[in-house]
Amino acid sequence: MMQKLAKEIYNWCQSKGLWGDNIIYFNGKAWSSNPTWSGEKGKEIADELYEYEDRNPLDYFEYANPKTLSMSFEGALYEALNAWDLPCYDGTEEELQGIFKKYDLYWEFGNAWNLSAYEL
C-alpha cells in the first residue's frame, strides 16, 4: 500500500511541477529525485526517480514515521506547502491530503521541510 501511495505522490508532484529535491521514505527504502546519495548511484525507476535501499527516515529527520510513509522536500514542493497564501498554490495542501485520505491516512508536518503519514 505504501509503495502505491508513494507512486501516486510522485505522479502528482510530476504533474504539478513539484518534483525535485524530494525524497519519499517507505518500506525501508527511499525514492529520491537525486541520482546519487552520498556517492551511491540510485536505481532509476522512472523519470527523475531513483530508488535507494535500507533508508530509515529517522536517520535524516526527527519527526518521521517509518511504519507508514515520510517525505522530505525542498524546492517547489517546499514552497507550495509553506507559501500557501500565494494564489498559484491554492488547494495544493488539500490535494495532497486527498491523496493520503484515499489510503485512510493523513499527513502532518514534522518541520517545514518534511512530513509523515498517520492513520485516520
Residue ranges and their predicted role:
Residues S32-G110:
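Acidic, low-complexity, intrinsically disordered interaction modules
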